[in-house]
Regions:
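ATP-binding N-terminal substructure of ATP-dependent carboxylate-amine bond-forming enzymes
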Residues: 1-94
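Short beta-strand-to-turn element immediately C-terminal to the catalytic PLP-Schiff-base lysine
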Residues: 7, 123, 154-158
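Generic secondary-structure signature for well-ordered alpha-helical cores
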Residues: 21-24, 59, 84-87, 111-115, ...
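Short, hinge-like loop/turn segments at secondary-structure boundaries
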Residues: 44-48, 83-86, 107-109, 137, ...
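Acidic/polar helix N-cap motif
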Residues: 47-50, 102, 125-126, 158
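Conserved ATP-binding module of the ATP-grasp superfamily
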Residues: 65, 116-118, 135, 139-141, ...
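A conserved helix-loop-beta module that forms one wall/lid of the active-site cleft
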Residues: 92-152
Length: 183
């Protein structure tokens, strides 16, 4: 069986190591991989967030099964593209991946289901967000809505930290497409 793992981090290294142990694995490719992964698997220069590119690569390399490691390709719909092309894939659809890729969507789902979750508010205006933070006080959690490579959640112990976090999110240090929610 020819297997492709999408990603290049520690999670994908662990997956590659484990999959390589299976005698059914004839060829293991990791894209893009990294130097550590290259010691145990073939690495390929491939954009893991481009569904059409991944599908074409799988067809050209007779890939039987794909494991999507990182959240970004899932949010980009790569698993949907693979399934649409009839390629077996381990990873949720883009719609299901929204639970990971959008904090506000997850909060909305929790609220609709009656699942306990911290109080929250979503803002698209910096002044309104700052007014809310001032009214709530600290400590408070400020989150960017979306994938932010681990930099989207700020636990602000002081009001100044919370206001600085909002400036960072709205000011573009964190991707502009993210809008904060405040827990």
């Amino acid at each position: 069986m020819n297997i492709l793992i999408l990603g290049g981090g520690g999670r994908e290294h662990a997956l590659a190591w484990a999959i390589k142990q299976n005698p059914k694995c004839d060829r293991l490719i990791v894209a893009p991989g990294n130097a550590g992964i290259a010691a145990i698997a073939e690495c390929a220069a491939l954009n893991p967030e481009d569904g059409a590119e991944v599908v074409a690569f799988c067809e050209e390399n007779a890939v039987d099964f794909v494991v999507v490691g990182p959240e970004a390709p899932l949010a980009a719909g790569v698993a949907d593209a693979l399934r649409g092309a009839g390629i077996l894939c381990f990873g949720p659809s883009a719609e299901a991946a929204r639970l990971e890729s959008s904090k506000s969507f997850t909060k909305e789902v929790c609220d609709a289901a009656g699942a306990p979750t911290a109080g929250w508010a979503r803002f698209s205006d910096l002044d309104a967000a700052k007014a809310h933070v001032r009214a709530q006080g600290a400590p408070i959690v400020v989150t960017a809505d979306g994938l932010a490579a681990g930099k989207g959640v700020i636990v602000a112990m002081t009001l100044d930290e919370a206001l600085a976090a909002l400036d960072e999110i709205f000011g573009g240090t964190i991707d502009q497409s993210f809008r904060p929610s405040v827990d």
